[in-house]
Amino acid sequence: MKQKCVLIITDGIGYNKNSKFNAFEAAKKPSYEKLFKEVPNSLLKTSGLAVGLPEGQMGNSEVGHMCIGSGRIIYQNLVRINKAIENKELEKNENLQKLLAKCKRVHIIGLYSDGGVHSMDTHFKAMLEICAKNGNEVFAHAITDGRDVSPKSGLNFIKDLKGFCENLGVHFATLCGRFYAMDRDKRWDRVKEYYECLLGKAYKVPNLLEYLQKSYDENVTDEFIKAAQNENYKGMREEDGIIFINFRNDRMKQLVEVLNSKDFKEFEREKIFENLLTMSVYDDKFKLPVLFEKEKIENTLAQVISKAGLSQLHTAETEKYAHVTFFFNGGKEELLENETRVLIPSPKVKTYDEKPQMSAFEVCDAVKKGIEKGEDFIVVNFANGDMVGHTGDFNAAIKAVEAVDTCLGEIIECAKKHDYAFIITSDHGNCEAMQDEKGNLLTNHTTFDVFVFVQAKGVSKIKDNMGLSNIAASVLKILDLEIPKEMNEALF
């Protein structure tokens, strides 16, 4: 069976039997049509317990890529934190106790929704409660979502938070959309707006809930809410404690850097803060205490390939580069021996409905070059289905799928020419459900299964009831390498 192999991850493209508001179904996609007819295919589970999340919880790119790259189900921080809250372990956490003892005033910052991709509203509330019951003066800084949940769901979430804060005697201090507070693309002007807000230098309002409603009236939805502060909030002091409740790292790193790094040069800062505590490890370069340390994941797909002396290429555009490197490699940043990484810059547009093809064709070229060079294994992510799906623009999402389809056709042709096997799948769905039955926009991921196609010597059928954790062993089987005991079985 031994063959070189390309693993193609078509981010945000899932299977929805309902063709209404389904951008995948509506797209012209000759490459996919050919795959369905000619290549062994099946469906994989990408949500809930199949990827280490709570039952019914939609999957996401971080979890999906970790599952694919490690070849096993890793119980995600979301599940670990839920358990720690239930069994009261969180309030006993040593790093949390140290911060609460040291700092009288404590600020809780995070995305406030039940999306479960970056954070969870229940975690935010649990932290407010622990800090308030400890006798600290507590400030809530809510970041509105509108991306992993519907665009105007923030009103109910913020109403809930405001009432919760009032009952606890906690200050509801600031409000800001994730577009500003959670940028990950080095748009420092956005982060600066939020930094100024935390310092008490933003637009002041008597009621943050009314401010949110007013933003809706002006057609500004949750993701894009401009930073505002309660008129009684006077800003953070340098001796205050700051707790970040997002468990996913990629969209909190820049904010932590702005608040804490002594070497930060992107804009002038009035204050730097030392007493920070993060929910998980945001970046190894931050020497900060964390609530939930990383679980060590050994014998990942990339490690096994590297140890065997084979070469591998990991490529994607900016938006998904961390997913095919850091997350795919089991939460490790370091480059492995014989591993090459190619980062293709994402287009500089405000939202990707402005350019639905994104940088797919450049990513496609990088893959073809890798095949022509003879890389033993290539993993690539096409971001379009997900990133354009998040905009809620149905027509743009159709164009996104069509761009991916064109790229698939080119890669498949190149793979066949050079006798490569290929596996095509997605980390989760998104663009296959762009509106609900009432016509409300759906910008979030779905819980639908995703397609998997395997073209390799000797493969004629894929087993039933498989998930993302069965892909790594499949790649190793194609490469004729030993499958480590930590991995789940192959798809065939």
Swiss-Prot record:
<feature type="binding site">
    <location>
        <position position="445"/>
    </location>
    <ligand>
        <name>Mn(2+) 1</name>
    </ligand>
</feature>
<feature type="binding site">
    <location>
        <position position="11"/>
    </location>
    <ligand>
        <name>Mn(2+) 2</name>
    </ligand>
</feature>
<comment type="subunit">
    <text>Monomer.</text>
</comment>
<dbReference type="GO" id="GO:0004619">
    <property type="term" value="F:phosphoglycerate mutase activity"/>
</dbReference>
<feature type="binding site">
    <location>
        <position position="184"/>
    </location>
    <ligand>
        <name>substrate</name>
    </ligand>
</feature>
<dbReference type="InterPro" id="IPR011258">
    <property type="entry name" value="BPG-indep_PGM_N"/>
</dbReference>
<dbReference type="Pfam" id="PF06415">
    <property type="entry name" value="iPGM_N"/>
</dbReference>
<dbReference type="InterPro" id="IPR006124">
    <property type="entry name" value="Metalloenzyme"/>
</dbReference>
<keyword id="KW-0479">Metal-binding</keyword>
<feature type="binding site">
    <location>
        <position position="118"/>
    </location>
    <ligand>
        <name>substrate</name>
    </ligand>
</feature>
<dbReference type="InterPro" id="IPR036646">
    <property type="entry name" value="PGAM_B_sf"/>
</dbReference>
<keyword id="KW-0324">Glycolysis</keyword>
<keyword id="KW-0464">Manganese</keyword>
<dbReference type="InterPro" id="IPR017850">
    <property type="entry name" value="Alkaline_phosphatase_core_sf"/>
</dbReference>
<feature type="binding site">
    <location>
        <position position="390"/>
    </location>
    <ligand>
        <name>Mn(2+) 1</name>
    </ligand>
</feature>
<dbReference type="Pfam" id="PF01676">
    <property type="entry name" value="Metalloenzyme"/>
</dbReference>
<feature type="binding site">
    <location>
        <position position="386"/>
    </location>
    <ligand>
        <name>Mn(2+) 1</name>
    </ligand>
</feature>
<comment type="similarity">
    <text>Belongs to the BPG-independent phosphoglycerate mutase family.</text>
</comment>
<feature type="binding site">
    <location>
        <position position="178"/>
    </location>
    <ligand>
        <name>substrate</name>
    </ligand>
</feature>
<dbReference type="GO" id="GO:0005829">
    <property type="term" value="C:cytosol"/>
</dbReference>
<dbReference type="GO" id="GO:0006096">
    <property type="term" value="P:glycolytic process"/>
</dbReference>
<comment type="function">
    <text>Catalyzes the interconversion of 2-phosphoglycerate and 3-phosphoglycerate.</text>
</comment>
<protein>
    <recommendedName>
        <fullName>2,3-bisphosphoglycerate-independent phosphoglycerate mutase</fullName>
        <ecNumber>5.4.2.12</ecNumber>
    </recommendedName>
</protein>
<feature type="binding site">
    <location>
        <position position="428"/>
    </location>
    <ligand>
        <name>Mn(2+) 2</name>
    </ligand>
</feature>
<comment type="pathway">
    <text>Carbohydrate degradation; glycolysis; pyruvate from D-glyceraldehyde 3-phosphate: step 3/5.</text>
</comment>
<feature type="binding site">
    <location>
        <position position="427"/>
    </location>
    <ligand>
        <name>Mn(2+) 2</name>
    </ligand>
</feature>
<feature type="binding site">
    <location>
        <position position="320"/>
    </location>
    <ligand>
        <name>substrate</name>
    </ligand>
</feature>
<feature type="binding site">
    <location>
        <position position="61"/>
    </location>
    <ligand>
        <name>Mn(2+) 2</name>
    </ligand>
</feature>
<feature type="binding site">
    <location>
        <begin position="147"/>
        <end position="148"/>
    </location>
    <ligand>
        <name>substrate</name>
    </ligand>
</feature>
<feature type="binding site">
    <location>
        <begin position="248"/>
        <end position="251"/>
    </location>
    <ligand>
        <name>substrate</name>
    </ligand>
</feature>
<dbReference type="GO" id="GO:0030145">
    <property type="term" value="F:manganese ion binding"/>
</dbReference>
<dbReference type="InterPro" id="IPR005995">
    <property type="entry name" value="Pgm_bpd_ind"/>
</dbReference>
<feature type="active site" description="Phosphoserine intermediate">
    <location>
        <position position="61"/>
    </location>
</feature>
<keyword id="KW-0413">Isomerase</keyword>
<dbReference type="GO" id="GO:0006007">
    <property type="term" value="P:glucose catabolic process"/>
</dbReference>
